[in-house]
């Protein structure tokens, strides 16, 4: 066996070991990182702050471990909003929203009242906290407003009567039809 042939035999002998190690590494990484979580929701009459109300619908997918998010939907102000990030959104305005980023958590209030305790929502397999851009028809592809929002399969404000599982910053909370799957 010449030097060249011996070298080829060593490479051929190592190929199965390298492939086995690669498969093991990929499968370990895949099992350690959970997959994306899908969600969809429909919320009407989001309100609670002194002025304003909105409807919000949409969905997408996110991964709380990696920070991946891709989600969007429709929105409309159903009553003039006079405070917070959506201040100036008039009744009947609003077309769509899309995601700026996935947030690990946020603090929020459903009513904006000083007496209401501050609550915290955390992104997990049943709750998604987003920073989103909201668009009005006349503004084209330039976002009209940027605000945080929460969608959850669970009640995010058990201190308030009824189920509150969606929130828009500066507008309030509402009960939504919400589904999450992983």
What is each model feature region?
Residues 81-135:
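An exposed acidic His-Trp-rich patch
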Residues 1, 26-33:
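Basic/polar N-terminal segments that are highly enriched at the extreme N-terminus
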Residues 1-8:
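Short, Lys/Arg-enriched N-terminal segments with co-localized hydrophobic residues
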Residues 11-13:
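Mobile, glycine-rich extracellular loop/lid and propeptide segments
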Residues 15-26:
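Bacterial N-terminal signal peptides
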Residues 30-96, 101, 163-182:
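N-terminal segment immediately downstream of the Sec signal-peptide cleavage site
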Residues 113-172:
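Extracytosolic low-complexity repeat regions of secreted or lipid-anchored proteins
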């Amino acid at each position: 066996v010449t030097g060249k042939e011996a070298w080829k035999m060593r490479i051929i002998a190592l190929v199965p070991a390298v492939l086995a190690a690669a498969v093991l590494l990929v499968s370990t990484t895949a099992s350690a990182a959970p997959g994306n979580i899908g969600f969809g929701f429909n919320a009407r009459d989001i309100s609670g702050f002194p002025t304003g109300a909105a409807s919000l619908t949409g969905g997408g997918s996110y991964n709380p471990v990696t920070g991946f998010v891709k989600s969007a939907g429709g929105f409309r102000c159903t009553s003039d909003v006079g405070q917070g990030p959506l201040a100036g959104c008039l009744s009947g305005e609003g077309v769509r929203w899309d995601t700026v980023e996935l947030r690990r958590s946020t603090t929020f209030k459903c009513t904006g009242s000083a007496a209401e305790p501050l609550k915290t929502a955390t992104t997990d397999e049943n709750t998604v906290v987003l920073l989103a851009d909201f668009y009005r028809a006349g503004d084209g592809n330039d976002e009209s407003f940027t605000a945080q929002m929460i969608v959850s399969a669970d009640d995010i404000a058990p201190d308030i009567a009824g189920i509150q599982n969606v929130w828009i910053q500066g507008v309030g909370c509402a009960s939504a039809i919400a589904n999450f799957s992983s």
